[in-house]
Regions:
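N-terminal Rossmann NAD(P)H-binding glycine-rich loop of SDR-like oxidoreductase domains
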Residues: 3-22
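Conserved glycine-rich Rossmann-like NAD(P)H-binding loop of the short-chain dehydrogenase/reductase
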Residues: 25-36
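Conserved Rossmann-fold cofactor-binding substructure of NAD(P)-dependent oxidoreductases
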Residues: 41-63
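Conserved NAD(P)H cofactor-binding loop of Rossmann-fold oxidoreductase domains
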Residues: 68-71, 110-111
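Catalytic helix-loop patch of NAD(P)-dependent Rossmann-fold dehydrogenases
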Residues: 78-93, 100, 105, 114-159, ...
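C-terminal substrate-binding subdomain of Rossmann-fold SDR/epimerase-dehydratase oxidoreductases
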Residues: 184-302
Length: 302
């Protein structure tokens, strides 16, 4: 297949490009940044520009994997309009381009944040979207577009609701796993909110890529929850990071954020019935991430 990967120069994107090329797909990257390797066909531009979308998604394209997005919850709260333009308007331009060319397969990186605060309820695909942040709202809005394009134009739109993605190559990310790795590598303390018993699901990056490959092969509309299938507390994440790095990472306990959810528990069974099988548990995933940080440096958050 000829697959266009938007955001292909990013964290998940680089892994997706490598996996798709390894299985024999012809890959075109569309990104604001050049791809690290000149051997990859990378079109540099802004997906909010209709002209660039036409150049990136050219005739002969078989599928689009749409990973490009602004994913910062903080930025979405500061400038929701800019995030809406990138996460929703650009998505609609891509869908329209696919409709014009007859490209039916469209896989999208969504988020479990579309569900919002569900209390003690386990999050699965049946939970109605009730996002609490502008970022979550943009992903939910994109999912509504997919539903409409699937019903109206018979497009095989697949929304993958990722949990917290981590892994090799995340040096510039400002997520808790990346911060833990930087603390272990260069010193400094990790901030832990409240008692540290808030629980989250952390999924290794190559497991999300496996889900992308499943999505490309479905040939029908679908929404899937993609995670490790096991939620861990911040304390367990911190302690496991200390164990795999061999560093006693100091922790600063600070007041909990207002409105922070005590637990995010997801059910990945629907994806598992389609062949999804996470290969990394937390210790193995953190060990692989640490190995990459040691080999390539800690980088810094943007």
């Amino acid at each position: 297949m000829r697959v266009v990967v938007t955001g292909g120069s990013g964290f998940i994107g680089r892994h997706a490009v490598a996996a798709l090329q390894a299985r024999g797909d012809e890959v075109v990257v569309a990104d604001l940044k050049p791809f690290p390797s000149p051997s990859v066909d990378c079109r540099v531009g802004d997906l909010r520009d209709p002209g660039f979308v036409e150049r990136a998604v050219a005739p002969g394209t078989d599928a689009v994997v749409h990973l490009a997005a602004i994913t910062s919850v903080l930025l979405s709260a500061k400038d929701p309009h800019a995030v809406f333009q990138t996460n929703v308007d650009a998505t609609e331009l891509l869908l329209e381009r696919c409709r014009a060319l007859g490209v039916e397969r469209f896989v999208f990186a969504s988020t479990n944040a579309v569900a919002g605060d569900v209390g003690a309820v386990t999050i699965d695909e049946a939970v109605l979207p009730h996002p609490l942040t502008p970022y979550g709202a943009t992903k939910a809005a994109a999912e509504m577009l997919f539903s409409a394009y699937a019903a109206s134009y018979h497009m095989a739109t697949v929304a993958l609701r990722f949990t917290n993605v981590y892994g090799a190559g995340m040096q510039t990310k400002d997520s808790v796993v990346a911060r833990l790795m930087r603390c272990a590598l260069g010193g400094g303390a990790i901030q832990i909110y409240g008692d540290g018993e808030q629980r989250r699901d952390y999924v290794y990056v190559t497991d999300t890529v496996a889900a992308i490959e499943i999505g490309l092969g479905l040939g029908r509309p679908e929404t899937l929850t993609i995670g490790a299938g096991r939620s861990v507390s911040m304390n367990e994440l911190w302690q496991t990071a200390c164990e795999v790095t061999g560093v006693a990472i100091p922790a600063d306990h600070v007041a909990a954020k207002p409105g922070e959810m005590p637990a995010v528990v997801v059910d990945t069974s629907r994806a598992c019935t389609l062949g999804y099988a996470p290969a990394y548990d937390l210790a193995a995933g953190l060990a692989a991430t640490w190995e990459d940080f040691v080999a390539n440096g800690g980088g810094r958050a943007p």
